[in-house]
Curated annotation (Swiss-Prot):
InterPro entries: CTU2, Rossmann-like_a/b/a_fold. Plays a central role in 2-thiolation of mcm(5)S(2)U at tRNA wobble positions of tRNA(Lys), tRNA(Glu) and tRNA(Gln). May act by forming a heterodimer with NCS6 that ligates sulfur from thiocarboxylated URM1 onto the uridine of tRNAs at wobble position. Prior mcm(5) tRNA modification by the elongator complex is required for 2-thiolation. May also be involved in protein urmylation and in invasive and pseudohyphal growth. Inhibits replication of Brome mosaic virus. This is Cytoplasmic tRNA 2-thiolation protein 2. Interacts with NCS6 and URM1. May act by forming a heterodimer with NCS6. It comes from Saccharomyces cerevisiae (strain ATCC 204508 / S288c) (Baker's yeast). Changing S428G: In strain: YJM627. Changing N193S: In strain: SK1, V1-09, YJM230, YJM320 and YJM339. Changing P7S: In strain: YJM230 and YJM320. One of its GO terms (biological process) is tRNA wobble uridine modification.
């Protein structure tokens, strides 16, 4: 079996088969790299970001790019590897000059910080140090996921009135004695794995975007493959957040954060590549060593011809125990080798979507996920839902109702009613107009109503996150907090 892209006179043995075409290692690496670079040059804005601009002394001639790197995600690592090769080419062609610099940002949790730093140190020594000897092209940052809570001076308790789906909130100041943590939020409020997964994803995305906003980057490069983007699209629809799809995929407009315009655009350079192609690239370039889940990565589906038959990592999860993200991931992983056209169709269709027309009197953003709100979900749910219970009448019904009141579920409902009345009272007595005008998107409202304990959640107020130059000592600027986690080009902490 020979490579179909090599010259006819010197064909190498094929090692990869993808999209009904056979590749050798060298041709496949070129195929993947070309797909990514094509997306990086998709329009004039991004072409000016990534190419070398003369004269070098001109202001803005070197762009700042933020690359969020997850050490459990192959896509972002492969993207970084291809970007590294592009920068290396630019230094050779332009007398040690490059068109852009890359800041790698990793969000970590307490459980994996040590292994992440170990993997990053290896990555720096093998990939980044060579370029940084020429110039300060790569910078590496770490941020604790708990900084999402530590940087807010106020938090809000959101609660849903289950009679009319109206949302109430109560704000309070944060000090050293009542700082929240991710572990506390997930353990105290989330009833299932789907809600935990959703909140973690929201927190990480917001941290990355806040970091980009504060430090003046020109673009954020996300490592989502075509498969991953399709998973996210279907997940958003299932979660009631379909209106976010157009904004999520938008690479033409500058992003917004808390209704403020940002100076960066979002880019998905891997959107023309299937995840099996990314996994194959990872294996060929021996990049799995930089991930924290090496064993799991090695058994992921790929399109290598000499694929090793590796044992499963254990019994697969039952569907009922999977999160929405895991279910969509499993579906697309199962079909992408034989029916990749389904994945591309999902993405092409989503790319054609535009933002819905808003029926709101004024622009509004969800207080949890920060997505735009186009219609009031509380009013719509109240119109289509019957929430009034049938009255208790017979002796048997009264007996069963008493049993329910004494159960854990009944006690939880009693606690919910008490908390709702307390927050309602606080909201009615508050002089803060914003507290009486709290809005959540439909997806977060449903999340709060069905997957959060007692239908209430404590969440930082994004507009009080002091991560700007005017930050106080208690709420340090985000970049200052990151200083203690910096790794320089020599791999030293």
């Amino acid at each position: 079996m020979e490579c179909q892209r090599c010259p006819a006179s010197a064909r190498n043995p094929a090692t990869v088969e993808s999209r009904k075409e056979k590749f050798c290692d060298e041709c496949f690496i070129k195929f993947v790299s070309t797909k990514q670079r094509k997306q990086m040059m998709k329009d004039e804005y991004f072409r000016n970001l990534f190419k070398v601009i003369y004269p070098f002394e001109k202001e803005g001639s070197v762009s700042k790019i933020l690359l969020p790197l997850s050490h459990s995600d192959s896509g972002s690592l492969v993207m970084l590897d291809i970007v590294h090769d592009l920068l290396l080419e630019q230094t050779k062609q332009h007398n040690n000059r490059t068109g852009f610099t890359v800041d790698v940002l990793t969000v970590f949790t307490e459980e994996n910080v040590s292994v992440i730093k170990e993997r990053m140190e290896s990555l720096i020594n093998e990939k980044m140090s060579q370029l940084n000897k020429i110039s300060n092209i790569f910078n590496v940052h770490f941020i604790d996921v708990n900084e999402f809570f530590n940087n807010a001076s106020e938090v809000s308790t959101f609660i849903i009135d289950n009679e009319n789906f109206e949302i109430f909130s109560k704000s309070k100041s944060v000090d050293d004695s009542n700082i929240l943590t991710l572990k506390e939020i997930l353990g105290k409020y989330c009833l299932n794995n789907s809600s935990r997964s959703d909140l973690i994803s929201i927190i990480k995305t917001q941290l990355i975007k806040h970091f980009a906003y504060e430090n003046g980057y020109n673009a954020i490069m996300w490592g989502h493959s075509m498969t991953k983007l399709s998973e996210v699209i279907i997940s958003l629809v299932v979660k009631g957040k379909g209106s976010q799809i157009a904004t999520f995929l938008d690479s033409e407009s500058f992003d917004t954060l808390n209704n403020k315009p940002c100076k960066y655009k979002n880019l998905y350079p891997m959107k023309d590549l299937l995840s099996v192609e990314i996994e194959s690239f990872l294996q060929i370039r021996n990049l799995a060593q930089f991930l924290i889940n090496v064993e799991e990565t090695n058994v992921k589906p790929n399109c290598l011809i000499a694929r090793k038959s590796l044992p499963s990592l254990g019994q697969q999860k039952l569907v009922k125990n999977m999160t929405i993200n895991e279910i969509t991931n499993k579906y697309f992983q199962d079909i992408q080798n034989d029916y990749s056209n389904i994945i591309s169709t999902v993405l092409r269709t989503a790319d054609k979507l535009t933002q819905p027309k808003s029926s709101m009197a004024k622009p509004s953003q969800c207080q949890i996920c920060q997505s735009k709100i186009y219609t009031n979900p509380s009013n719509w749910l109240n119109r289509i839902t019957v929430t009034s219970p049938y009255p208790v009448e017979t002796t048997e019904e009264k007996y069963l109702f008493k049993q329910w009141q004494d159960s854990k579920l009944g006690q939880s409902h009693t606690h919910y009613v008490e908390l709702l009345n307390e927050i309602k009272q606080g909201a009615s007595n508050s002089l803060d107009v914003e507290d009486g005008d709290v809005k959540l998107c439909y997806g977060c409202l449903i999340l709060l109503n069905t997957s959060i304990k007692d239908k209430n959640l404590v969440w930082p107020k994004v507009d009080t996150m002091d991560i700007t130059a005017n930050a106080t000592n208690k709420n340090k600027e985000l970049s200052q907090i990151l200083d203690q986690f910096e790794i320089n080009s020599d791999g030293e902490e």
